[in-house]
């Protein structure tokens, strides 16, 4: 069966964490959560990633988005490793919880397993990141191999896109950033678009003359 992906409800797992017991649905509450895995504590790329998450925590907080990490190491390991993360990026504080999944059952349910990375206990997590909405449904997923660290600017951009799309019923084009034009969904007629977007919209003049590429500001 395919693993957890966009449109699926995230499992309501309860795990130990650096902040005590966490039940995922309770943690999500009525907001958005970035649920992300890392292959292992005390490893180089993971240290830079979780430090970057700490640096960007305020950006996510401003958007009403919480962070929640997970790996197969135990809670005590997470706590000890946090000292290294904060020393690597002075001034950064790891304020978000990191869950422990020593038996690796949670990462399987969350579709966070890297089939190519293993240790003596079994398969390790990939660098997976799910953005979970208030309805507990996965809205977006990133999946990176162990050799490639994630780009936090792109994670922020993706969050901004999801929040904008949800609020204004639009979509965002390639390389979009907040303040730039968005596109109107194909299922919205021109008449509906005039009511939805009284500020107006522009239709790209394309060879097909189909009028499907419409831009507006929100």
UniProtKB/Swiss-Prot annotation:
Disulfide bonds: none
Keyword Nucleus: yes
Catalyses which reaction(s): a hydroperoxide + [thioredoxin]-dithiol = an alcohol + [thioredoxin]-disulfide + H2O
Ubl conjugation as UniProt keyword: no
Signal peptide boundaries: none
Keyword entries, A-Z: Antioxidant, Cytoplasm, Nucleus, Oxidoreductase, Peroxidase, Redox-active center
SUPFAM superfamilies to which the protein is assigned, alphabetical: Thioredoxin-like
Pfam family, one: 1-cysPrx_C
GO CC terms, sorted: cytosol; mitochondrion; nucleus
Tissues/organs with expression: Embryo and aleurone cells.
EC code: 1.11.1.24
InterPro entries recorded: AhpC/TSA (IPR000866), Peroxiredoxin_AhpC-typ (IPR024706), Peroxiredoxin_C (IPR019479), PRX_1cys (IPR045020), Thioredoxin-like_sf (IPR036249), Thioredoxin_domain (IPR013766)
The family this protein is said to belong to: Belongs to the peroxiredoxin family. Prx6 subfamily.
Note: The active site is a conserved redox-active cysteine residue, the peroxidatic cysteine (C(P)), which makes the nucleophilic attack on the peroxide substrate. The peroxide oxidizes the C(P)-SH to cysteine sulfenic acid (C(P)-SOH), which then reacts with another cysteine residue, the resolving cysteine (C(R)), to form a disulfide bridge. The disulfide is subsequently reduced by an appropriate electron donor to complete the catalytic cycle. In this 1-Cys peroxiredoxin, no C(R) is present and C(P) instead forms a disulfide with a cysteine from another protein or with a small thiol molecule.
Its job: Thiol-specific peroxidase that catalyzes the reduction of hydrogen peroxide and organic hydroperoxides to water and alcohols, respectively. Seems to contribute to the inhibition of germination during stress.
UniProt-recorded name of the protein: 1-Cys peroxiredoxin PER1
Naturally occurring in which organism (per UniProt): Hordeum vulgare (Barley)
Gene it is expressed from: PER1
